A protein has these predicted regions:
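Conserved short strand/loop->alpha-helix "switch" segment adjacent to the catalytic nucleotide/phosphoryl-transfer site
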Residues: 26-48
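Short, structured helix-loop boundary elements
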Residues: 15-18, 40, 44, 103
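Conserved beta-strand-loop-beta-strand hairpin that lines the nucleotide-binding pocket
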Residues: 1-10, 55-130
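Alpha-helical protein-protein interaction elements
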Residues: 16, 37, 49, 105, ...
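Histidine-centered phosphotransfer motif of kinases
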Residues: 42-60
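Preference for short coil/turn "hinge" residues that link or interrupt alpha-helices
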Residues: 11, 27, 52-53
Length: 130
């Protein structure tokens, strides 16, 4: 598959979008023959964390987010597009806080992650080498 192609789904700004996006990613990986891949759990957790961040911090009310997966046989990229402003930053994660560890987990589980500004909002992405 060409890295420029991929599969996507739109999700509303709702907490129930997190399991929906995770299922989409799981079904996509299965369709690409990656169901038994040793990093599938890492990918699914990163999808959950990035979608949660988009729902809580990135998507203005009444808008949707986009989950986009690309795979070229060597590299899997997860992208979460939202129309919110700002740039997310990984923190050390306060051990007493209820949240704040999502990007720390993405940092630890993926090979690389970053933010790409778009005309309207941003795309937060993470890569996994196969």
């Amino acid at each position: 598959m060409d890295i420029s192609s991929g599969l996507e789904t739109h999700c509303p700004r709702e907490r129930r979008s997190v399991p929906r996006a995770r299922r989409f990613a799981d079904e996509t990986l299965t369709g690409w023959g990656l169901a038994g891949w040793g990093r599938t759990g890492d990918v699914l957790l990163c999808v959950s964390e990035l979608v949660t961040n988009a729902v809580v911090h990135g998507v203005p009310p009444g808008r949707q987010l986009l989950v986009f997966l690309r795979w070229d046989g060597r590299l899997l990229r997860v992208e979460i597009h939202d129309s919110g402003g700002g740039e997310p930053r990984a923190t050390d994660g306060d051990t007493c806080a209820e949240g704040g560890r999502g990007l720390l987990l993405v940092t630890l589980l993926s090979d690389k992650w970053g933010v790409r500004q778009r005309e309207l909002g941003k795309a937060v992405w993470c890569d996994f080498a196969l």
